[in-house]
Amino acid sequence: MDIILKASIPKLREKLLEALQAVLPIVAIVLVLCFSIAPVSPSILLCFLLGAAMIIVGIMFFTLGAEMSMSPMGERVGAMLTKSRSVPLIIGVGFLLGFLITISEPDLQVLANQVPSIPNMTLILSVAAGVGLFLVVAFLRMLLGIALPKLLVVFYGLIFVLAAFVPKEFLSVAFDSGGVTTGPITVPFIMALGVGVAAIRSDRHAADDSFGLVALCSIGPILAVLILGIAFQASDSTYVPPILPNVSDSVELWHLFHEGLPTYIKEIATSLLPIIAMFGVFQLAALKLDRRTLGRIGVGLAYTYIGLVLFLAGANIGFMPAGNYLGQVLAGQSFRWLLVPIGMLIGYFIVKAEPAVYVLNKQVEEVTDGAISASTMGAALSAGVSLSVGLAMVRVLTGISILWFLIPGYAFAIGISFVVPKLYTAIAFDAGGVASGPMTATFLLPFAQGACEALGGNIVTDAFGVVAMVAMTPLITVQLMGLMAQLKQRRARQAQPVSAAALAFADLPDDAIIEL
């Protein structure tokens, strides 16, 4: 154990540098706004800065912890299920994994509180069942080799048909649920399951099919909330803004965070326990990993736990009030149109601080053998989230229905999926669920809510939906990146000189070449 801890110290330093590069640009933007056009109280600013420090340390521990624990656990379980060749086992375990992981996701509790007309436990169980069902669909797709775009057409078609019958109060929350429930605990494990399943296959499409699990799992919550929206009558939901901190000195500031920490200590423990318990069953029944491997996974789980506690405490206590207040101040100015470019700027950088984005970018780089680098993926995600936040701010200012953005957006994303390389499509639809994580829920959503409140808009219909917009645009930007890469490769092949022998064979049919 001591050897594992010592070996992880250099990696922690590396992760700290990555975390600083991700969070400091957001801090710089907020500080510039606070000292120029959007003044805030010292209390809010101090909470924001302490929250930022906790987020940096949290990202450092989480990213290394996920690499050491969540990824190898998921890969080994996925590989074991595939080796079993038992469809009933894959269906049963797949559903149970999806259900248990989702039911303990902290962000799902937040979502349930935002829909007062549906009992909390009814919503939580329905969404968890939706994720479990679609994790089974994702497994079967990989094993049967079904093309992802075909399933996306069917299921998103069903979603938009149901949306026509759902009260408008449910629409934004329903589409937000798809991004909220694929959080920092769910994503690393589910993505690793995909890699494990694909690793057992030896065909040339195995790498393509290692992605797409998060994409399909994001559909389950949307369908669940839409169906519940039809079954339950919409009620007048009362928006409760976050309580703005009011601390007069450093001791009160520490007490504010110290009092909030036990909540996240308990939440993250509850979230990780089902995954640990399921892995323990697999370890005893089939995996039989050696003590050194288990020790490494144990240290990784400890890092993951510490990282998520610090991250969520910093985001909820420090970032959420700051985001809400900044939105109010900017929308209350005569130059409220600045919400759009400022929102785009914040969106561009904030996705870099999403914990699960690190896991996605690293896995993409590994599976593609560096053909798609982590920096390229990061740029595509940043561009997508920047665009989505800009469009979300347009909605806040104008009150336009979210369907005017989602229907053409998803139609375009699914349409180009039939001409884009399969790998890019699967990565793109996974990226949508990954990008819309806790940073979106704790800063961008409160930012939109604060702006909407200052403008006197309908927060339920106009401010909610930011998560859905953030989940949609990466589908387009990542696929466009793939399309450009495909065109670049085609031009490179066309530019290569062709030998006379190759030209002679080019005009012959395939069977003639085989006979020769």
Where in the sequence are the language-model features?
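Helix-loop-helix junctions within the multi-pass membrane cores of secondary transporters/permeases
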Residues: 78-80, 87-158, 336-417
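Transmembrane helical segments that form the transport core of multi-pass membrane transport proteins
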Residues: 243-356
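Juxtamembrane and boundary regions of transmembrane helices in multi-pass small-molecule transporters
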Residues: 2, 138-153, 169, 173, ...
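Hydrophobic core segments of alpha-helical transmembrane domains in multi-pass membrane transport
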Residues: 24-37, 51-61, 93-100, 130-141, ...
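Transmembrane helix-loop junctions in multi-pass membrane proteins
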Residues: 32-46, 66-74, 100-115, 134-146, ...
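Intrinsically disordered, low-complexity non-transmembrane regions of multi-pass membrane transporters
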Residues: 1-19, 23, 74-88, 202-213, ...
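Interfacial loop-to-helix junctions that mark the boundaries of transmembrane helices
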Residues: 13-19, 40-50, 82, 115-124, ...
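Alpha-helical transmembrane segments and their helix-start/interface "positive-inside/aromatic belt" motifs
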Residues: 14-22, 46-52, 80-88, 148-153, ...
